[in-house]
């Protein structure tokens, strides 16, 4: 008998009543968070049999929720969301004992703080790598990038604005951190504006600790024809380079060559304070039949997966000497739900709480 190698979703029962904008896994892949235009977010836990169970669902903003991200578990179960209502909200899971049975534990998501200093729609947020502490970068439709830091990593209710950068004078759509411990931290910002200013759609900043500021790297010029919908640094860096993948119509892969002055010493101390020279090399163009929307690296940085506007998930694998080959291609239309899944989906829609009831949850 031939085995069924088709890929099937774990679960088709939805939690949202409107368009889902973001799906985010925690660093261990055991938990998942989703957010949507219905102003709600949901937390999912993976069961031992591989299925996903919805453990929480609540209204978290006063507008459409664009992003939801997880902090590293070292800082606790912390989730951040950003929204059309111009705010960023930090949530933390708290374990409490049931009043009926003291041995039984229940979890609640508590709103720790609301960051509301943005004057426009917040389009993306990203936590820093854990070796930098509990920090977060955000970008908005006015082209501003803000960097926040929690001075006490055990207190998620206090966040200070430490830097504000004007990346563009047009809309910012995505922001990401470099993950390397060996080099000075980098932040890459992408613009999804159709008419980019001077054709600049990607800006990269370098953190110079001795100067206590983020410096724009003007030597890195990306010639990209389409708006930037996503960009990510590879989790694995070479000694002399970073790798950056950019979704701009197709998926573009770049190596960013690092100068010796940007490489940290073994104890994490910088070389003499000076601006480093970076060189940009385009190593691959991963074609997409439709506009690439989101992209991710795997843990080893050897596979890039992207989702497209045609509902297709494509994956490419790196071989050697900067060669990439297509690994797989899956389309959501190829999956036909069973009658049991259809009935479960309809049942979930009729039994879900009303939005007015969701407002009272965890507030």
From Swiss-Prot:
Q: Which UniProt keywords apply?
A: Lysosome, Membrane, mRNA transport, Nuclear pore complex, Nucleus, Protein transport, Repeat, Translocation, Transport, WD repeat
Q: What Pfam families does the entry give?
A: WD40 (PF00400)
Assigned GO CC terms: lysosomal membrane; nuclear pore outer ring; Seh1-associated complex
Q: Which GO terms describe its molecular function?
A: structural molecule activity
Q: Which GO terms describe its biological process?
A: cellular response to amino acid starvation; mRNA transport; positive regulation of TORC1 signaling; protein transport
Recorded phenotype for the gene knockout or disruption: No visible phenotype.
- In this chain the WD repeats are located at 15-54, 60-101, 108-149, 158-206, 223-264, 287-326
Q: Which InterPro entries match?
A: Sec13/Seh1_fam, WD40/YVTN_repeat-like_dom_sf, WD40_repeat_dom_sf, WD40_rpt
Q: Where in the cell is it found?
A: Nucleus, Nuclear pore complex; Lysosome membrane; Nucleus envelope
Query: SUPFAM superfamilies under this entry?
Result: WD40 repeat-like
Entry similarity comment = Belongs to the WD repeat SEC13 family.
Purpose of the protein: Probable component of the nuclear pore complex (NPC) which is involved in the trafficking of macromolecules between the cytoplasm and nucleus.
Q: How does it assemble?
A: Component of the nuclear pore complex (NPC). Probably part of the GATOR complex.
> Under what name is this protein listed?
Nucleoporin SEH1
Which species is this UniProt entry from? Caenorhabditis elegans
Could you tell me the gene encoding this protein?
npp-18
């Amino acid at each position: 008998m031939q085995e069924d190698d088709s890929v099937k979703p774990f679960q088709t029962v939805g939690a949202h009543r409107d368009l889902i904008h973001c799906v985010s896994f925690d660093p261990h892949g055991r938990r998942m968070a989703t957010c949507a235009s219905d102003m709600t977010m949901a937390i999912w836990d993976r069961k031992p049999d591989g299925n996903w169970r919805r453990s929480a669902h609540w209204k978290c903003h006063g507008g459409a929720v664009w992003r939801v991200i997880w902090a590293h578990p070292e800082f606790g179960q912390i989730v951040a969301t950003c929204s059309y209502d111009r705010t960023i909200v930090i949530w933390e899971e708290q374990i409490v004992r049931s009043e009926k049975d003291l041995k039984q534990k229940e979890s609640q998501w508590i709103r720790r703080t609301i960051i509301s200093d943005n004057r426009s729609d917040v389009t993306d947020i990203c936590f820093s790598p854990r070796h930098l502490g509990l920090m977060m970068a955000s970008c908005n439709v006015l082209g501003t990038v803000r960097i926040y830091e929690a001075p006490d990593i055990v207190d998620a209710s206090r966040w200070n604005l430490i830097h504000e950068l004007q990346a563009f004078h047009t809309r910012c759509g995505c922001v990401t951190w470099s993950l390397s411990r060996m080099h000075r931290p980098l932040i890459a910002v992408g613009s999804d504006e159709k008419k980019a200013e001077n054709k600049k759609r990607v800006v990269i900043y370098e953190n110079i600790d001795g100067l206590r500021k983020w410096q724009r790297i003007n030597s890195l010029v990306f010639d990209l024809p389409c708006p930037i919908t996503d960009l990510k640094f590879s989790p694995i860096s070479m000694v002399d380079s970073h790798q950056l993948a950019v979704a701009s119509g197709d998926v573009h892969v770049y190596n960013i060559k690092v100068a010796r002055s940007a490489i940290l010493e073994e104890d994490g101390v910088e070389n003499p304070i000076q601006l480093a020279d970076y060189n940009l090399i385009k190593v691959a163009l991963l074609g997409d039949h439709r506009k690439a929307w989101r992209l991710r690296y795997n843990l080893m940085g050897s596979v890039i997966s992207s989702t497209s506007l045609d509902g297709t998930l494509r994956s490419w694998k790196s071989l050697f000497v900067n060669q990439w080959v297509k690994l797989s291609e899956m389309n959501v239309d190829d999956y036909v739900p069973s009658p049991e899944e259809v009935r479960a989906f309809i049942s979930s829609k009729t039994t879900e709480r009303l939005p007015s009831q969701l407002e009272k949850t965890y507030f």
